[in-house]
Amino acid sequence: MTTPRPIYIGCDPAFRAGGFWAAILDMEDKTIRFMSFDLLSWHDFLRSADAPPSCFICVENSNLQNKSFDMTGTKAEIARKGRNVGCNQAVSELAYRSAVLQYGARNVFQVSPKEKGVKITDTRVFFGIMKQEGILLPPGATNQDQRDAAKLALICQRKALLEGRFKADKVPQIRYNPAP
């Protein structure tokens, strides 16, 4: 029996007018597609017929870092930035919890912004990484949020494989008999 190739979803939640992006990496055909969500549509998608019945998800959870990044500006600007950070932390935590409720803690990872690492700002570098991984991108340009989500999907793949959460096909055991 062959185990179907896994699906990895990278989710970079944010609280903003345009919502946030998720990258869905399907290892069956090595394609990636991008979908835009707000928190409620993310929750609904995970429970819909359009969502994969089984997958691994990696959510960037800024709540893990619990830090305001930019403390420059007037008191009012700092307060506004603090509220924005708080909103993003709440959305991140709820997006993570929603995924865990649907797929279970074993299939859902969370990483802090620090653990996610630097952004891939150069599209040529991004396309090079995808080519190196053998992943087919949809036609057209990508934005920074899509590239971040794709990076999270790749992190998800590594974490699932390294932590042994994906059950690969059993390799038949070969017994060596040295006797003639």
What is the role of each PLM region?
Residues T2-P180:
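Phosphate- and other anionic-substrate recognition elements at nucleic-acid/protein interfaces
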